[in-house]
From Swiss-Prot:
The modification Sulfotyrosine is found at residue 52. The gene is CCK. InterPro entries: CCK-like, Gastrin/CCK, Gastrin/cholecystokinin_CS. This is Cholecystokinins. The lineage of its organism: Eukaryota, Metazoa, Chordata, Craniata, Vertebrata. Binds to CCK-A receptors in the pancreas and CCK-B receptors in the brain. cholecystokinin 8 binds CCK-A receptors more potently than cholecystokinin 58, cholecystokinin 8 and cholecystokinin 58 bind CCK-B receptors with equal affinity. The modification Phenylalanine amide is found at residue 58. It comes from Canis lupus familiaris.
Length: 58
């Protein structure tokens, strides 16, 4: 019974995490936020991200 109680919340969280990742990949806003995070972490990524955003506009 203890294993069943511990297993259910983990499976539920795993399902929510997988669902969140799928939505982040599909949603343009999710990609935009990833690009902004890369710009904040490393200035050298700004040029490549700017070209990628320009490519997304088409």
């Amino acid at each position: 019974a203890v294993q069943k109680v511990d297993g259910e919340p983990r499976a539920h969280l795993g399902a929510l995490l997988a669902r969140y990742i799928q939505q982040a990949r599909k949603a343009p806003s999710g990609r935009m936020s990833v690009i902004k995070n890369l710009q904040n972490l490393d200035p050298s990524h700004r040029i490549s991200d700017r070209d990628y955003m320009g490519w997304m506009d088409f």
